[in-house]
């Protein structure tokens, strides 16, 4: 088994692994690879020519007022189901950390989707910081105007609102990817 950076020739295998690991639609998978993948650094574990695990480092900043640090947001970390429980993901993330440190990233960030994943990443040395939870149900009835925003407009509004709070500053490519899934809106 070897660990390496991904390349364009890996795309068919990476997309298949993504579908298997997350169950996303073809449209969602294609959106990531068309919009975010070109600015990301992909890492994979390969065995006998087959990609069996992958993770993508999206360059970001963690900002707080005038202060910021470079972070690599580890996104879509997955291992083929036939190869889980063998320590492959831990080794892949260690390889990614080593490579990203060479590129002068100050830290790595993750957003685990479940408590089980949070515990798993904690076992690898990741620590939780100011966790936010979202409740998509029970929102009050909309009042006023709902205005669609471009990714650039959303980025400006987000920076204005979060300026004095620690927050991730997303790249325009990542915001375009998010917008392709749901869009950005301002309520007035």
Describe the predicted segments one by one.
Residues 3-77, 164-188:
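A conserved beta-strand-loop-helix scaffold within acyl/acetyltransferase catalytic domains
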Residues 5, 112, 148:
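Conserved residues at beta->alpha junctions
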Residues 93, 100-113:
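Conserved GNAT acetyl-CoA-binding A-motif
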Residues 119:
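Thiolate-centered catalytic microenvironments shared by cysteine-dependent enzyme domains
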């Amino acid at each position: 088994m070897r660990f390496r950076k991904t390349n364009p020739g890996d795309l068919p295998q990476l997309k298949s692994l993504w579908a298997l690991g997350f169950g996303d639609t073809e449209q969602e998978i294609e959106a990531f690879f068309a919009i975010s993948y070109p600015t990301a650094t992909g890492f994979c574990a390969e065995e006998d020519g087959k990609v069996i695990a992958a993770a993508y480092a999206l360059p970001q900043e963690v900002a707080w007022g005038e202060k910021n640090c470079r972070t690599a947001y580890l996104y879509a970390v997955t291992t083929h189901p036939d190869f889980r429980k063998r320590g492959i993901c831990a080794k892949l993330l260690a390889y990614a950390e080593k490579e990203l440190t060479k590129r002068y990233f100050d830290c790595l960030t993750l957003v685990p989707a479940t408590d089980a994943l949070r515990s798993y990443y904690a076992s690898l040395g990741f620590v939780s910081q100011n966790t936010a939870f979202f409740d998509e149900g029970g929102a009050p009835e909309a009042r006023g105007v709902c205005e669609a925003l471009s990714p650039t407009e959303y980025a400006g509004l987000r920076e204005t609102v979060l300026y004095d709070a620690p927050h991730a500053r997303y790249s325009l490519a990542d915001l375009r990817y998010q917008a392709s899934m749901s869009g950005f809106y301002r309520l007035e």
